[in-house]
């Protein structure tokens, strides 16, 4: 899967978080889970499932006449590649610019500053 296909919508993130948490889930399980958080129709959720299936993020297997959906991508991989795409798009690939933007605009606690220092020192 190339980097461009790693762009997913907020709604698709909702779905993927459920799949990563449950490992396997039927469409009805997914619908129930999403409807506890969002006011989406079952048809909308089924469309979302189909879209992610066609994009190659999920696959399905038949279990007693019911499709069980599961992720084809690791959560950490998609988060990394999505973040990388964002940095390339918004910051022209400059990770330094991203960090500087947040450090300058956010009020960081001493603990957060120390944590950043420790991370950088390990590199």
From Swiss-Prot:
One of its GO terms (biological process) is response to antibiotic. Residues 74-123 are annotated as: Important for dimerization. Its main location: cytoplasm. Upon exposure to beta-lactams, proteolytic cleavage at a single site impairs dimerization and abolishes repressor activity. Keywords: Antibiotic resistance, Cytoplasm, DNA-binding, Repressor, Transcription, Transcription regulation. Gene3D superfamilies: Penicillinase repressor domain, Winged helix-like DNA-binding domain superfamily/Winged helix DNA-binding domain. One of its GO terms (molecular function) is DNA binding. SUPFAM superfamilies: Winged helix' DNA-binding domain. Monomer and homodimer. Transcriptional repressor that constitutively blocks the transcription of the gene for the penicillin-binding protein MecA. Binds DNA as a dimer. This is Methicillin resistance regulatory protein MecI.
